[in-house]
Amino acid sequence: VLVDVDLRKSVIKDRHHIKDADKLPDLGYFLSGQSEMEDVIYETQVENAYIVPCMNLLENPSALLEDARFAELLDKLAETYRYVIIDSPPLGSVADAAQIASLCDGAALVVRAGETSRSLIKQSFQQLDQVGCTLLGVILNRAQTTGRAYKKYYGKYGKYYSQYGYGYGTYGKEAAASSDGTPSK
C-alpha cells in the first residue's frame, strides 16, 4: 500500500487520476477523525496495489501527523499489507518528513540529478540518522541518460558485460556454434 503523506503539495492524486478526488475521504479525513481506515484505502489499476491518498490540502498537517492516529494507521497497515510505502515531503523542507521517518523501518532518499546539492543530501542523511531511520538507499531521479557524459561512463560496460552473455558481443553466438559437443574458446 502506498500512503501519500505529502499533506502540503501532493501529486499522487493527479498521477493516479482519481475522479472527484476533492469529494472523497482521504488521509486527512482519517487523521482528523472524520473517516475510518477502511474508508480511505483505494484500489489502484495495478493488481494487489492500494493507495491511501491525500487529496485535499490541510491547514495544519504537522499537528495531524503528531497525533496517535497516524502511528496507529501505519501499524494497522503493516499488519494488513506486505509493504507500506510512504511518499513524504522532502527532508529539509518541513519538519513533517523527519517526523514521518521516525515511524518508518527505513527510507529511500530520492535526489534529483543536477539539482539536489551535496550539502542537502548530507543534511538529509543526518536527519534520518537523528530520528533512527535506516537509510535503505538513494534513488537518482531525472538523470540524463543520453549524451557524452553518460556514454563516457556507461558505454564501457557493453564491452565488459559481453563476456557474460548479456546480449552484447558474440558470447551467445559462440556458445550456439559449439553446440556440436566441441569445446568453445
Question: What are these model-derived regions, one by one?
Answer:
Residues 1-185:
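P-loop NTP-binding module
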